[in-house]
């Protein structure tokens, strides 16, 4: 019902939501550790991957606070209702990520938000500090990565997605403008 009103996930993937969205989001947990204290899910939309990570963190002996940021009031209203319904302790920010100026997070995560180049520009211009970024990228990941490398020095590794062999998870330890 909410998806019809707010376009939280693609209509093409509603029937396979568990595999396509939840399992896809959950795989990030393998790249988190006890040093990850504050996670910011940028462009959270339907709460993916942030809500899923928050739900499963205890099963992986992890403790972190989860922040979700989205500029859409409708999506934020949905996120707040999920937070309340599931009795989670999410910090939900209704603003453009550019407004998170000079905030400190240990880990930034994002799924289906912006191309890498634009993502890095936003993070650097906003002076958001981080130790690690985990980006979930689809089939055009190499085009995005190669484009971003023209403008940024990127210290990263990338891994195959467990839900789609054409997708990758980028674990980024540092990024700076060239």
What are these language model-derived features?
Residues 140-178:
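Active-site capping/gating segments
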Residues 41-45:
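Conserved S-adenosyl-L-methionine
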Residues 46-62:
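Conserved SAM-binding loop of SAM-dependent methyltransferases across substrates and taxa
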């Amino acid at each position: 019902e909410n998806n019809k009103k707010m376009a939280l996930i693609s209509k093409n993937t509603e029937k396979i939501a568990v595999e396509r969205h939840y399992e896809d989001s959950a795989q990030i947990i393998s790249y988190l550790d006890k040093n990850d204290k504050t996670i910011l899910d940028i462009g959270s939309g339907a709460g993916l991957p942030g809500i899923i990570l928050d739900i499963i963190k205890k099963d992986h002996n992890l403790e972190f606070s989860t922040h979700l940021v989205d500029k859409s009031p409708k999506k934020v209203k949905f996120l707040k209702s999920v937070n309340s319904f599931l009795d989670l302790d999410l910090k939900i920010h209704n603003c453009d990520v550019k407004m998170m100026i000079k905030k400190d997070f240990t880990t930034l995560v994002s799924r289906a938000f912006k191309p890498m180049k634009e993502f890095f520009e936003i993070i650097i211009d906003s002076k958001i500090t981080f130790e690690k970024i985990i980006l979930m990228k689809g089939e055009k990941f190499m085009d995005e990565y190669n484009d971003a490398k023209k403008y940024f020095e990127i210290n990263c590794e990338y891994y195959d997605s467990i839900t789609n062999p054409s997708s990758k998870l980028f674990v980024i330890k540092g990024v700076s403008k060239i």
